[in-house]
């Protein structure tokens, strides 16, 4: 909601300043300035949001988010209509990314033979938005129920998630 008065504007400005300072400290820890390569800054930000864990395996990632064994992964695959936006990106190992391939997390869980709830449990402690969690769980809702629409078209094809008013990252 937009600020309604000077006090709310001041509070919002202070929150923005604190977030900016926190982000800058995080980048400084990894020797990146604010003009650093966007993909490197994005990896650091995602590592922080994920609390240093892989959302697909639940295992600890290397302490350095710039480790060459890690890469950015599209949660909802690009080949299926996924966008390169923060809400659709996760940091994981190259090997996990290759194994997941062009699958949604739900399809990847089926490939691994693990319950999807187990994959979702990996994300519970992560600092993810509701939108990112929705994208991660895309495909789980097979038919309309209450206020939740099916993730599938009438012909059974998986719909593309609504990425909303999100700015592309790449």
Language-model regions, residue ranges each:
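Histidine-centered nuclease catalytic patch
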Residues: 58-91, 100-106
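Domain-exit/linker segments immediately C-terminal to small folded modules
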Residues: 87-170
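Short, charged surface segments at domain edges that flank catalytic/cofactor-binding sites
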Residues: 1-59, 82-85, 125, 129-147, ...
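Proline-rich intrinsically disordered, low-complexity coils
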Residues: 2-3, 55, 62-68, 77, ...
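Short, well-ordered alpha-helical packing segments
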Residues: 43, 47, 51, 55-58, ...
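Generic ordered-secondary-structure signal
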Residues: 35-38, 54-58, 65-71, 90-93, ...
